[in-house]
Each structure stands twice: as C-alpha cells, then as structure tokens.
C-alpha cells in the first residue's frame, strides 16, 4: 500500500484521510508537463490502479497556490520532429485516458493558472474544484498550436461547443467564477484540496 511516493522534480503522492493526494511539484513552480513528467505520472497511476482492488481510494490532483499546471513545455515541443510530436501526443493521451478511466473518483483541486495541457489534465478528472484566484485557458491557438491530449473532445462535452470554441480559438482566459458559471468547474473553495476532501467524506457518510 502506497503511503508516500515522491518523484523528484515532478510530483509526490501522500495519503490524507479518505484520499490520496498527487501534488505536482516541478522545480520552476509552473508544473510543466514535460514528456518525462507525463511518463512518470502514467506509471504512478498504473501502480495506484493495481492497488485499487485491495483498497479503493479516491485521488486528488493538485499543484501549488500559483500554478495547477501550465501544460506542456513549449521549448520541448518546439524541438520535436513530426514523428516525435505525434508520439508525444499519444503519450499525453495515454495519461489523460488513465485518469478518465480511473476506478475511483479523481478530483482536480485547482489553484492559480490551469492552462493548455494543464487544463486537459483537469478535464480528464471526474470533478474540478477551483480556488477563487484560479485562471483557466487554452492559449495554444495564439501560439499556432492545438492540444493533442483530448481537450478538444472533453471540453465541448462539458461546456458546449460554442463556449469551448471561445476558449480554444480566441485563446480566452477565464476566472474561476466564470468557469463555475459555464460548468467548467463544479465548485469554488478557498482551499480546493480541503474542499475535495470534504466532498469525499460527505459522499462516503
């Protein structure tokens, strides 16, 4: 049974009451989803999935106060060849699908910036709780990029095609209040991790 897992420069996993908390911890603080990070996350989820038959536990994914995740490393993407970019897209999709198909509830506890592939990560979770200062966006279009990690499918299903196009094509950034209004997040809490834990306790009582 995993009580504490730490992958230097990427994330650590700890137990807290009814849930496991996976906290992104990149050294620069923006929680970029590099290829190495995505692969490490996928491996960690596979290990946790193997344990679910013994002790099913929900998972809370969080970042830090200022950044949930800014998504992929743009410098890394710029250096990719065509085949490498295709493979990186497939690697990211594998992670997002592992989260979406996880056998226990997965909640994104979002503070600060949740952008690009970071938003894809949040969209793959089953629920999203945001801090009042959270900011959401998919600014790839402004950079000549489009996500390959499933966000173009999950976001329209969640908030509708028109609103999703506003976020994708206009590279619009929205507040937590607006995200709640359009259904992108399920709740706002000053401490999203604590809010997620409260929801899980209430659901199990």
What are these regions (language model features)?
Residues 103-113:
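A short, small-residue-rich loop immediately preceding and capping a beta-strand
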Residues 2-27, 169-205:
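Amphipathic alpha-helical segments at domain termini/boundaries
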Residues 22, 61, 73, 121-123, ...:
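Hydrophobic/aromatic residues within transmembrane alpha-helices
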Residues 95, 115-168, 196-198:
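CoA-thioester-processing core
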Residues 62-95, 114, 142-144:
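Glycine- (often His-adjacent) and acidic-residue-rich active-site loop
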Residues 106, 128-129, 188:
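Short, well-ordered beta-strand core segments
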Residues 1-62, 97:
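Conserved CoA-thioester-binding segment of acyl-CoA-metabolizing enzymes
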């Amino acid at each position: 049974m995993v009580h504490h897992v730490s992958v230097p420069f990427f994330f650590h996993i700890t137990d807290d009451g009814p849930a496991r908390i996976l906290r992104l911890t990149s050294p620069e603080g923006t929680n970029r989803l590099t290829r190495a990070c995505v692969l490490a996350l996928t491996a960690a989820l596979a290990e946790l999935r193997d344990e679910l038959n013994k002790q099913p536990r929900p998972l809370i994914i969080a970042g830090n106060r200022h950044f949930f995740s800014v998504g992929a490393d743009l410098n890394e993407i710029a250096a990719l060849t065509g085949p490498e970019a295709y493979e990186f897209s497939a690697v990211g999709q594998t992670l997002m699908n592992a989260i979406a198909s996880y056998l226990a509830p997965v909640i994104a506890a979002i503070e600060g910036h949740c952008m690009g592939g970071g938003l894809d990560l949040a969209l793959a979770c089953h629920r999203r709780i945001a801090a009042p200062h959270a900011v959401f966006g998919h600014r790839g279009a402004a950079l000549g990029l489009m996500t390959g990690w499933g966000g173009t499918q999950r976001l329209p299903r969640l908030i509708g095609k028109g609103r999703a196009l506003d976020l994708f094509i206009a590279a619009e950034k929205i507040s937590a209040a607006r995200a709640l209004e359009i259904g992108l997040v399920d709740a706002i809490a000053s401490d999203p991790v604590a809010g997620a834990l409260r929801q899980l306790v209430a659901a199990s009582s």
